[in-house]
């Protein structure tokens, strides 16, 4: 499915299905005896979406021989990648709230359950922004399993291509208070100019002491669309509505660290490979790695 300026999705199709795939990875990482992350809500959310492929992936029941390029090593490298990514952003929020931040915004929140599972200090407000169907599904599913937010949770059912800053303000967001922003797993699905506009809007809403965390994928510049299209074709044969080659926006774009520094942030990054080493996880061989290549995880602080 080719992207359009006003395309929509649920959690079983298009960009939404990638959120479900990521949640399945978190569920598998949660079961890993190494115990790097703990997301008890990932599994029930994925089961509620009802895509058989992802349910079987969580349960270790996929017939990998029937799926092109799917091997136990590749699946494990994906799970490990989700583990270090989730751990990085979990730690980011803990550090931000330890520094006194009590206002959080999660952009394109998908099946993110941090508002329910992190130990937020009293008085913390977590704003979640995503398409209306995605927000409604997650809220209803977590209510059905008896989950309760560990912070004040406010949902903003709007696409990021809309006037989300106005919707955020209408929900009670205070631009005078420091904010911890998260844009996880988002940027590759934005055109280059939309990526810049996102950070421009965040900067305009950020008081000194605000922070932002995201990731940058240098490989999006020379994206191997053919390799990804072959992998996606195999997924679609098994009922997964994902064509990554048509979902992402490839080509030149500003490096996030440089762009944020130019807007008055102090940004720094760490590669996924470095995070693997930090947590004692084996770095996958290139043939088993993400087709996008290396990922840089970035955190930044608003300096003034």
Swiss-Prot record:
The keyword Methyltransferase applies. Its EC number is 2.1.1.-. One of its GO terms (biological process) is methylation. S-adenosyl-L-methionine binds at residues 130, 159-160. GO terms for molecular function: methyltransferase activity. It is an enzyme of class 2 (transferase). The keyword Methyltransferase applies. Pfam families: LCM (PF04072). Coiled coil: none annotated. Keywords: Methyltransferase, S-adenosyl-L-methionine, Transferase. InterPro entries: Ppm1/Ppm2/Tcmp, SAM-dependent_MTases_sf, SAM_mthyl_Trfase_ML2640-like. Exhibits S-adenosyl-L-methionine-dependent methyltransferase activity. Belongs to the UPF0677 family. NCBIfam families: mthyl_TIGR00027. This is Putative S-adenosyl-L-methionine-dependent methyltransferase MAV_4444. It comes from Mycobacterium avium (strain 104).
